[in-house]
Amino acid sequence: MKEIVQKTDPATFEIVKNSFYKIAEEMRVVLAKTAYSPLLKSAGDYSCGVFEARGEMVAQGPDLPIHLGSMPDAVRAIVAVFGSDVHDGDVFIHNDPYFGGSHLPDVNVVRPAFCSDRLLGYTCLRAHWPDIGSATPGSYGAVTQIFGEGLRLPPLRLISGGVLNTDLEKLILANVRTPDERKGDLAAQLAATLRATERLKILARRYGSAKLIGYMAQVMDYSERMMRATLMELPDGLGTFEDFCDGDGIADDASGADAQFRIRVSVQKIADRLIVDFAGTDSQVKGPMNAPLSVTASGVYCGLKTAIDPNNLTPPNSGCWRAIQIRAAKGLVVNAEFPAPVVYANHEISHRVADMVMGALANFMPEQVMACSQGTSAILTLGGVDPRNGRHYVSYETIKGGFGARPNKDGINCIASGISNTMNTPVEILEMAFPVRVEAYEVNPDSGGAGRYRGGCGAKRVWRMLDGADATGALCMERMTSPPFGLRGGRVGAAAMVTLTTPDGITRLLPSK
């Protein structure tokens, strides 16, 4: 096949490149203004992206780094299943962690973009639904197979030629606790992806479809060149790091103890490439702390890009990661095999991996990394019937801890760190939407690890259920038995802790899951 070389002047390239990223940003704005659930419209637990026709990511919005590695797999799943059977006006949906997803609550809406019957690429919006079924409100439960984690959607055609498959929509909504809210969130995802495809059509009419497709390839190639050039300026070396997760949420003995398990990583830098190897990591576990490889990859990419490109000069897309090779045998906790449960691992393992990559890099480029951050998404879900209106509710919150100490300054208090980029749900919105009252939300003093530069302090938050409120809760946390580590002689940060006080006044410590 004869290679076609497209010549582009630098000014036009910058305009088109930035247009792709602005399209992803506009998707974010549309979703935030139209979503129903506080988790989406206030906390921002979603990611938006523009993809070329094979499913490679051309541009990601300023969203969640946790999705860097797995969103391209989500779009590639659509390409693999439907091939050329993709038409203007179609929309696809899926959430299968073993088919390009991350965990079941993260629902992918994928819409192809056409101009004059030519496929330009895809837009994808991954949004965390506060509930996707299962026995536990919020879909976070200590189960031993993925079948217990909620409704699992393989790649499906939700809209065909502009016509909604209402039977599929009814099936989805029948399996969640808050169907009206989920219907509104799904509509917001559809609106955002539609806006993005319309923007791509405008670009195609301006520059021509063939040239626009060529620009997509050039943007990814540009990121690859930038990443490799940055790597060439850094020292070669090999570093290893080992850490232990608190457990998988499944009791391992009669006393209810939850055994730790090990993750081991080595990072080797050779010229303009990196090899990340998880040899020595424990096998997949019984509970939902098993990560699909794409989730692990997200943690790797986040940790590496933060260290190597701290000023974000390299546009994040699939081109960035061509210089990075990830090795992880199937069946490890970082490359789980079906039907292992995965819901906790999406954020807890990727948090862990991102911090551990920094720990490994500290062996040969210590001035590029920071110490361990809070190292967990610290999730609390509550669900039941709201006594104020008699309706089912599901609340899903992530609590912000501290940012790790940096080579030349302290960490930041109470901020999303590592693989996360979500915001606090404002207390006023939380109390309006759910039958809870937040009695305290404050910095936990002296909780950051001590050192020449201290780690950021964590947060203390106190919830009280309103009188008459029916609530079933679930926790998903790490760093209770394995506190955030320091680097280069820095001390560990404070361990996480959760207590429950019942109406009779008795207070007890809760496990991490």
Model-assigned labels for residue ranges:
Residues M1-D88, I93-K513:
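Glycine/proline-enriched, intrinsically flexible loops and inter-domain linkers
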